[in-house]
Each structure stands twice: as structure tokens, then as C-alpha cells.
Amino acid sequence: MATPTQEAIDTFMTITGSSNAVAVRKLEEYRGNLNRAVNAYFTHGDQNSYDAMDIDDGVTPVLSEARTTDPFPLRDPNFGRSLFDNDPVMSRPPFVSHPREAREIPIEVKDSNGPSGQSNDAPTIEDVTETAQAHGPAAQEAVIIDEVSDDDNQSAPTGQSRHAVPVGSAENNMQHYNDIEEQIIRAAIEASKMETGDDVTKSVTVQSAEREVLRSEGWKASSSEREASEMVSIPVQQGSRASNGRFAAPSSLSEDDDDDDDDDPDYVEEEEEPLVSHRPRRAVSGSRSSLNDDLPRSPEAEDATIHSPGAGNGFPSEWGGISSEEHDEAIMLEAAMFGGISESEYGVPYAHYPQRTQRPPSPSLTAQRLIREQQDDEYLASLEADRVKAEARRLEEEAARVEAIEEAKRKEEEARRKVEEEQELERQLVSKEASLPQEPPAGEENAITLQVRLPDGTRHGRRFFKSDKLQSLFDFIDICRVVKPNTYRLVRPYPRRAFGDGECSSTLNDIGLTSKQEALFLELI
């Protein structure tokens, strides 16, 4: 048989928290295989010392145990000890969780090592409906524990998961804090199921539930010494059914309560039936009246709870187990979102919050606001004036641009027309020059010499027949290209006579130009 190494033994002891002898024996059984030895230890455990039981949750592993340690270590007197020391926390008796209706059924513990019966290590019965826990010998019910080993769940041993913490002890306080998360989840689930007649859902957030649980746990921690000496049990009518569909069963917190129940003539034991429990949950020692107030119950039970002396620490169940501050915040949030909320929806009159009166502003603040408004108005006016000026300047520039374009077009048209006129005049002059009659010779008796003085001072002369028309003289003056046609008239100085376009068809002899030589000048019209 292989001898395990000291490193493997130390590792096994660190992981499992067992003794050196157990570590050596397990490692020798599995030939030094540390993984198989640890798995076998957590799977089978020490069967000679503990009752095997199929438990879903199992013992919290090392890391989980360290994680769920008391969050307030300064209050824990066992904080300096190791997690694996043989302290009361690691040697507490097992407990069994069962529903409310199962609490009326006797529960027996069957163990292969001995006959069933109650002992100091008897399983602690926990009510999953959050009623008070029955500890150790105080539990009158018997539980049949089905010894089925869970081979699949090898991460945690089952033999070390059944321990009970005495009420009022330091370990009980640590257990309270370890169960905060479970209480928060339960409170949130129970609150989410509650609805009003108008389908208005009142839900409890995880943060609010945590605050309330911490508040209640703080009160419990401060009064733990008083609870250790004096236990208060609330009798519950047997056979009554709560609003959540479970039977409300009596629960005892001490031996005195059990004795009282035995002496009570009205107490009737239910038919004993064996109960096989496969789903134990972690025990929560101490009173759970704060959480019982959050559970839905019958109207009579709610009225009795609300008017009972011990109901001052709980919150109304119709509000989902939330505090009055959170209830008021929810009402204000709903009023802000939906513009108001009617009191008839919940049947509870809500306190009207006084609106804060608006005080008039101070004179200096009013003057500053007035000055600022005037400055803003002046600034806006200057911006408007600048905008108007810019718009006028833009319009002027646009008009000037359009006018320049039109002027250019007009000049271009005028130049084109002038060119056309010149071209037309040139064609006319060419035609007139072609139609001008032939000049007679110098010795012709019927010929007449005409001298015309132009406006520029030059003189032009030519011989014509006396039978030629006056139009021939106008054509001769036009082809000289000094003045434009139809812009002048001929004048004879003595006797003065002017000849115009109306006499162009008359001959020279008819208009009185009969001398051999005549002098004429042009007069512009």
C-alpha cells in the first residue's frame, strides 16, 4: 500500500477539515490519489458517526463557507478560530426542512447504527413557510430520513450538513446573517405574488428587502440574550389553512412549550404518518415573526396579527411587506408618472404632502432679471437691424446686378442695330451711286453747275442737266458720306429758298435753278 506524502495529507486536511488519521486512511485507501480521496470523503463522509441523508443543498464547501461567514466579524467571538476547528458550529446537530402541513406529522429518524429516537443529535425541524423552528429535543414530530447517498453531488459532504445552532448563541447570530440572502429571496417572491383587486401589483425590490431583513436581524442580535432565557411561542390553530394553500401547524421553541401542549386538553395530535424528507434547507434559528407577517394569510389571521402587541415590528402584508417609507416613495413615484393616484384603489387614505409655497423673488434678483431681459431685447433688436441692413444691401446689389445686365444687353442691341443701320445705309448709298445720272459735258447748253457747301466747310460740285430731278442732287450729297440722308435740306441764299424732301420729284428747272452756276448750302434739320 502506497504511503501518502505529507503534502497530500496537508492538502486533504485543508480541503476537508478532517484529522490527520482520517486523511492518511483515505489517501491509503485510494493509493495516494488526492482527488479520488477528497471526492470519496465528501460523497460518503464518516458514516459511523453521522446519519446519511439525501440533502440537496449539502455542506457548504470551503470557499462557500468562507464566503458565508459572518459579515460582521467583530461581533463574532469565534472570529479568530479556523473554519475547520471543532467548534460548536461544526458539531451542531442536523436539521430537516419541511412544509407547514408536514409539521403536524410525526417524523422519525432511521439510522443503521441504532434504533430511531430522539437524542441530542436529532434533526432540527425547520418550517419552510418561515414559522418558528423546533430545536432538537423540543420537536415532537418524528422524521424518517431516507438514507440515500447522492453520488452525483460530490462537491459537498452530506454528513456535515445537519447541525443546529442554540438560540441566543454567537453561532445563532452568525446563522442569522448567513440566511439573509435566503430571506431576501423569499420575501421578494412572496411580495411579487400579492395583487390587489384592481390588478395593482405591489413588488418588493431586493434592496428594500435586504434593508428590512438587516433591520430586523439587528434587533434580533441586540435581544439575543433575552431570547436565550425566555422564549415566546405563538399558538396557531391546528388544521387551519393559510392563504397560500399550506396547513398552519403549531411550532415550539422550547421544552416548556411542549409541556404546555401536552397539558392542554384541547390539543389533539394528528394521525402519525412517516415523512421522508429529501429537501432540507438551512435552519434559521430565532423567531421569524417578521417574515410571517409578510406571508399572505386569512383576513382573521391578518387582523389578529396587526392588532397583536408583537406585530409592531412587522409591516402590513397588504403593502407587500415593505416599510412605510418605501410605500410612500412608491405612491409619490406613481403619482409623478401617472399624474395622481386615487385613494380608493388601495382602500387606505394617503397622507397629503404639503406643497412648498413659492416665495417672491428679492428686489435685487428682479432687477437683475429685468436688466438681463433688456439686454437680451436690445441684442435681439440689434441683430434684427443688422439682418434688415444685410437684406437691403443684398437687394441693392441684386438690383444693380440686374440693371448692369440689362444695360449691357441694351448697348449690345443698340450696337447691333447701329451696325445694321450702317449696313443698310451703305447698301442704299451704293444703290444711289448706281442710279445717279451721268454728268453732262462742260460745254452742254442745258447743263448747270451746282456748288454745295457742307457743314464741315467743304464744298462739293457737279454738273447736272436742267431736266434732272432734285432727287439726283440729294443722292449726290448722300454719296459724299458727310451727313446722313434725310437729316438736312438744301437752301439757296439769294433769293433765299429751302428745298426739302417734298420737292425731290421736281426738276431743277421747275424749282428755279436755271442759271449756269448755282451755289447752295446744307442746313441740318
UniProtKB/Swiss-Prot annotation:
User: Locations of Acidic residues compositional bias?
Assistant: 254-274
Phosphoserine modified-residue sites: 362
Pfam families from the entry?
UBA_4 (PF14555), UBX (PF00789)
Key word Ubl conjugation present: no
Q: Which UniProt keywords apply?
A: Coiled coil, Phosphoprotein, Ubl conjugation pathway
Chain spans, region Disordered: 67-96, 150-172, 194-328, 408-446
Stored PANTHER family? FAS-ASSOCIATED PROTEIN (PTHR23322), UBX DOMAIN-CONTAINING PROTEIN 8 (PTHR23322:SF93)
What's this protein's name?
Plant UBX domain-containing protein 13
GN (gene name): PUX13
